[in-house]
From Swiss-Prot:
Protein name: Methyl-CpG-binding domain-containing protein 5
KW Cell membrane (keyword) present: no
Quaternary structure (record): Homodimer and heterodimer with MBD6. Interacts with DDM1 via its MBD domain.
TM helices/strands, residue ranges: none
Residue ranges, compositional bias (Basic residues): 106-115
Tissue: Mostly expressed in flowers, and, to a lower extent, in seedlings, buds, stems and mature seeds, but barely in roots, exclusively in root meristem cells at tips (at protein level).
Gene: MBD5
Disulfide partners: none
Alphabetical list of Pfam families matching this protein: MBD (PF01429)
Primary location group: nucleus
Superkingdom of the source species: Eukaryota
Extent of Basic and acidic residues compositional bias: 92-105
GO CC, alphabetical: heterochromatin; nucleus; perinucleolar chromocenter
Species, as recorded: Arabidopsis thaliana
PROSITE patterns (alphabetical): MBD
Length: 182
C-alpha cells in the first residue's frame, strides 16, 4: 500500500541530457548554397564597443553592390525585387512621434517624415530575377504614342506583367545611374 509520497516526488534529473544554451546560432562557412550565383559574403568581427567579438555576416548583390545584413533580407529582396523596408515603431496611442523626439529636428524634416508615414507603400515587384525570359520581342503600336507590347515567341505578355517589368527596369536603371553595367 502506498502512502502517496511516491507520486509527490519529482522525477530524477537526467545528467546525460544536454542543456540548451541561448547562444546565438553562428553561421558556418559552407552554408551559403542557398545564395544565387555571383553573390558574395563577407564576415566581419567587431573590434570595439560592447559587442566586440561579435561576428557579423554581410551579403552583397553582384549587380548593384547592395549590402544585406541577413538571409531574410536577401530572400525578401530576391522575391520582391526591393529591399525590405524598415518598420516604423509606433507608440501605444498610435502616434509615430515619441515625447522624447518632440521639439527636435527641423520642421521641414518632421513634415517630411510625417508625409512618408501617410503615403501607401509601393506595390512589391512580382519579378523573378533568377528565371528571366531568354528572349523578349517588343513591338511598337500606335506610332504617335510610345506604346510597346512584349512578346515571348508568339505569346503576348499580360499588361500587368509588362508593368512589373517596366517597374523593375526603372528600379535597376535608377540604381545603376552612372555605373558601367557591362
Amino acid at each position: 500500500m502506498s502512502n502517496g509520497t511516491d507520486q509527490a516526488q519529482p522525477p530524477p534529473e537526467n545528467p546525460a541530457t544536454p542543456v540548451d544554451s541561448k547562444s546565438r546560432k553562428r553561421a558556418t562557412p559552407g552554408d551559403d548554397n542557398w545564395l544565387p550565383p555571383d553573390w558574395r559574403t563577407e564576415i566581419r568581427v567587431r573590434t570595439s564597443g560592447t559587442k566586440a567579438g561579435t561576428v557579423d555576416k554581410f551579403y552583397y548583390e553582384p549587380i548593384t553592390g547592395r549590402k544585406f545584413r541577413s538571409k531574410n533580407e536577401v530572400l525578401y529582396y530576391l522575391e520582391h525585387g526591393t529591399p525590405k523596408k524598415k518598420s516604423v515603431k509606433t507608440a501605444e496611442n498610435g502616434d509615430s512621434h515619441s515625447e522624447h523626439s518632440e521639439g527636435r529636428g527641423s520642421a521641414r524634416r518632421q513634415t517630411k517624415s510625417n508625409k512618408k508615414v501617410t503615403e501607401p507603400p509601393p506595390k512589391p515587384l512580382n519579378f523573378d530575377f533568377l528565371n528571366v525570359p531568354e528572349k523578349v520581342t517588343w513591338t511598337g503600336i500606335n506610332g504617335s504614342e510610345e506604346a510597346w507590347l512584349p512578346f515571348i515567341g508568339d505569346y503576348k505578355i499580360q499588361e500587368s506583367v509588362s508593368q512589373d517589368w517596366d517597374r523593375v527596369f526603372t528600379l535597376v536603371t535608377s540604381q545603376n545611374a552612372g555605373k558601367t553595367m557591362f
